[in-house]
């Protein structure tokens, strides 16, 4: 009877340890997703900044990104988005955002010791996804757009700083 009980406990331990990802596998996936997240965040920030400055210049100077006269800021933003499309930056941000979300969802079977890390990372990814949409589909007026992008960027930066402090050993430098 003891042998059967010992066998069952051993078998259960083996099965439990084989379920889910290993910590090293999770850390690899985290680092890959983290790198894509940073690319998405950085590119979105550059794009949001360019949108804001173009919008501002169109309203106050009546100029498009190429310096042409415009009486409507929508003309300037259309020209800017045409430039973004030609350069591929809009598609890149959308693709990185999709990749970031896909990689993050693949990490959902995190080891117990990494569950908090995963949950915190999901929170950051959600904010970065929202920020990337602000870059690819601006809305509102110039003031609200600037307030929203600035607030979101600062929020993301704060969360990333906290994430780096809490999970420094999981992220490769």
Protein language model regions, located:
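Mature extracytoplasmic domains of secretory-pathway proteins
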Residues: 86-121
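Sec-dependent signal peptide recognition
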Residues: 2-10
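Acidic/polar low-complexity scaffolding segments in large eukaryotic proteins
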Residues: 20-25, 112
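C-terminal motif of bacterial Sec signal peptides marking the signal peptidase cleavage site
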Residues: 15-18
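C-terminal amphipathic alpha-helix
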Residues: 26-77, 114-173
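N-terminal hydrophobic targeting signals that begin at the initiator methionine
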Residues: 1-2, 20
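Polyanion-binding interface signature
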Residues: 67-93
